[in-house]
């Protein structure tokens, strides 16, 4: 019996050249399968005139990751200048285990969107402001950054290369994520020796699961988002993981998001987990002043200007939590959330309801902003860039 098994094993052992041939065959079939999968992914759902769309359920996008076909990659040379970037298929990137971004969190990101007009043309909304904000953030994180022209060009190329992933008008937007990171290896604490700038994209719908319904927020008193002198005013990646615990706890209790208070007195409103906050009382709209702990949102800035144009008194100041609980309306702004109404806020077991709906200040401001972003309202401010 033992001899039989030994003999059988000998017959099953292949020569080295046959092993290699077998592995090559498997690799060939794997490559063919991957290629077939990519081609299947490229099949359009439908074609409307000259517009071809990717195979997605455009009516139920949500805010999940559906990677578009291409990403833009640009490296920083040793002299601190960024080289010519290029488009490449979306996919994984290689990083050393000792990369600065992995060990010390040296990275910042931006968020912008491409919008499709009714005629199929694509628009960007104030991408130059994202570029400027990234430069300011890079200075704070001691990183070189792309020039404004390099940044905007990268965003344009990414949007155009992924045009079929831009949702049909009224179905959503193409969320574009520029990311700047310390990709070079380093052991001791210090700036990375190399930096990589990547821009990738994903079609998205509403950020919150509530869609356009009003949000229910919880005022967080234990955890804080940022402190004076820190990096709360820039889009550092280090600002976001620390909010997950408070956010998860709030969601488990049925809330949409968390409102953070200042870290010193814990009495003044700062912002939500990923968006700015506005408080409406009569014809006055207040929002927390940017003092280094609050992100200077581009949507925030745009909404403030639209509100001023409509005759509201817009005030940037320290907003006491008691003012929030006595407000007529509260709403949030951001690239992802756009302009989102707040239905209730809970603070120290007290729950307050706010005005929402078509006649609310929030909805009026949102309608104007979205109208400009999508080309339905004439842009007389120079905010929109046609990239066709």
Swiss-Prot record:
Catalysed reactions, as listed in the record: L-leucine + 2-oxoglutarate = 4-methyl-2-oxopentanoate + L-glutamate; L-isoleucine + 2-oxoglutarate = (S)-3-methyl-2-oxopentanoate + L-glutamate; L-valine + 2-oxoglutarate = 3-methyl-2-oxobutanoate + L-glutamate
GO biological process, one term: L-valine biosynthetic process
EC number: 2.6.1.42
Gene3D superfamilies: 3.30.470.10, D-amino Acid Aminotransferase, subunit A, domain 2
Alphabetized Pfam families for the sequence: Aminotran_4
Keywords: Amino-acid biosynthesis, Aminotransferase, Branched-chain amino acid biosynthesis, Chloroplast, Plastid, Pyridoxal phosphate, Transferase, Transit peptide
Record's subcellular location: Plastid, Chloroplast
CDD domains: BCAT_beta_family (cd01557)
Interval spanned by the transit peptide: 1-22
Domain of life: Eukaryota
Note: Branched-chain amino acids are synthesized in chloroplasts, whereas the degradation takes place in mitochondria.
Stated name of the protein: Branched-chain-amino-acid aminotransferase 2, chloroplastic
Species this protein is from: Arabidopsis thaliana
Species classification: Eukaryota, Viridiplantae, Streptophyta, Embryophyta, Tracheophyta
